[in-house]
Amino acid sequence: MPSDYPVQIEVRSNKGQIVRYRLAPELYARSSKVPRSPGERVVQRLDDRFAIFHVPASSTSMAERDVLPVYRAQPSGTFAIPTGRLWVRFAEGIDATQKRELVEKVGCSLEELPPWTASGAWVRASSGKVADALAAAAVLQGLPGVEHVEPQMLLPSVRKSLR
């Protein structure tokens, strides 16, 4: 896995709780639709679209853009895969589209503006690289009018019995 991913990601909730994710450099994730290369070992299937593997990505023939880093939530160890999207929430009364130019200056773009809130947006690094999006999270958090920045993380689904 390339070393340009942060070793740790911290996400603070509105209530001040912090969730920490630690990079698992011995793992990587990619589409589970792509046939496995010799020597690849599936550690876990996240869903129908993604699987986590235990072989260093550099030893495969796949392009770097096809693999994603794997993090572990602390202290549970639950796998988490950053998608490269960031949820950015601006202060009440600030429309996300008003901040488009400022977001673009830090190397990101507004990717999706959900209809249920004008003050929030899904943002992605203009390069399309997950590492660039993760690096931009701290910069975005420091922008005027930004209240919250959180990387989108894919997590294993948890099924509960209805008993």
Which residues does each predicted region cover?
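Primarily auto-inhibitory N-terminal propeptides
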Residues: M1-R163
